[in-house]
Amino acid sequence: MPSSSPSMDESRRSAVPPKEPAGRICTVCSDRANGYNFGVLTCESCKAFFRRNASKHKEIKCPFSDSCQITSASRKFCQACRLNKCFAVGMNSEWLNDLKPKSSIVSGKFKRKKPDMKNNLKVEVDDTEEDLENDDEEQISVPKALLEKLINKANEKSKDRCTCKCQCGFYPITQRLTAYEPKDTTAVNSPQDISFSHHLHHSDSFYSSSTSTLSPMSVISCAPSSHDSSGYNTSQLVTQSPTNYTVSPASIPSSITELSPQMPSQYPPMLSPFQFGVMAQMAAPANFLNFPPMPERTWTPIQAVSTVPVTETLPPNLLEQIHSKIDKYIGVLNEDEITLLEELHVQNEPLNAPLIQWHNPKSIDGVFRIIEEALRRIVNMACQLSLFRELHVDDRKNLLKSGFGELLIVRGLMAYDKSDNSWNHSFGVRGKMEVKVEVLKNPKLEEHYKAHMNLLSTFGEDVRNNEHLMLIFNAAVIFHPHVSNLRDSKRVHSTQAKYFQMLLKLLTFEYGKSRADIAYSNLLNQVVELHRVNRTLLRVFYGLDIAQLDPLIRELCSFE
């Protein structure tokens, strides 16, 4: 007597597929679908994801609020919400169990592909890597030819030199490319950094030759020595030797004198726009950022940022408030320096304005939208500084492209609230958006989370809470003299020297000579640490879907 309930195979044969939407869109992530998988129209990625994780439904937990928006760009950020959506749209895990014993079908699949196996080895490797993603339990079957290829590759003797030739035309065809082994590997944070250093060894035209092995003091060669806070001369500061730099003993009990951990002597060089693109290809998945070389183009996104002086739109009472803040430094700073400090406060006011649009601070997507709006304001602020506008347009481009991440991080230091471990942003008239640092606790962001937490914990609280000092420090970060391909690096040196000179004068005025010396040394160390945190931030940007990024960020990262 037949069973009252049809078998799984019978139900699958008799089931009539629902009408497909136009364009075959994945019902889970809205990516392009390839067919019906487990009863639902999905893409290949969601099919593989469901096959790997359907049995782990109770084990995977959402690190946020179980309400993450799942799109083709954000689907990798939260496995729990993605799996919940798979079940919600009707994907059936029973079909998964029914498919596993059918090894003959799998064997037949590879058998049919055997004639083209040699030509499709690369495709098969890519497919195998995708199947292995987040999978340490299932058994994987691979074609024999592919297995032999992988074994032979693993047993290959490593070459002692590179015989590659440049194909893009950047180097002469006769240029011999060789691997580069850094002398001090302590400055390299990960295997990705090592390969990145190897790949960029010959890009001398993009690095300043003086950035190979530098200590914090020699990195900022234009910074005044802390033991001499009188009679500054900018032209002397630019060429001042760092060997005479001394600080007072670190026994003074104050939060401002807390020195950061000992920094390695090698300084991570700033990345040029060309090196941004190379790093993107090496740090991100191949299917994310496999783009042709960036063509020459005009600087439209950054040029489009408003350049109307903020002073024309500020109310008079706000200018009076700024003057009242900085009047105490009259006599400490000279007239030109007072003008520069006033300008920093004026240009900083738009950054204090509430955000225009609400974004969910508990989701990764919302956090990146906040970052996009903040970056737009930060770039606008930098473009309006008088000393910045005196530079050649190419130097302005290179400084912004190389330093936008560091400016964002410094702005985050100013907005950070240590009491509840969050960044606070105002919204509307009395609204507030509080972004918890914990939102960065994500497998994709783990490296940046650790580096950022180290910076937050070692940055002096007294300095971080002093708006005058942070604005000057922020300006000094903008004018980084070791950015490659600068037309007038001496002008950038001297400009940064002015801001470091102001910084040391204010530290001495606020805290006294001894404490100022130690605080100043700590800030120079933090500049080096800032570059390391910036590298981890860039890797986060390179792992995102560029189609979802703001045009300004795409331009800054040389994605287009």
From Swiss-Prot:
Zinc fingers, NR C4-type class: 26-46, 62-86
GO MF annotation: an example: RNA polymerase II cis-regulatory region sequence-specific DNA binding
Domain NR LBD: 336-560
Region (Disordered): 1-21
InterPro entries: NHR-like_dom_sf, Nucl_hrmn_rcpt_lig-bd, Nuclear_hormone_rcpt_NR1, Znf_hrmn_rcpt, Znf_NHR/GATA
Family, similarity comment: Belongs to the nuclear hormone receptor family.
Protein known as: Nuclear hormone receptor family member nhr-8
UniProt organism field: Caenorhabditis elegans
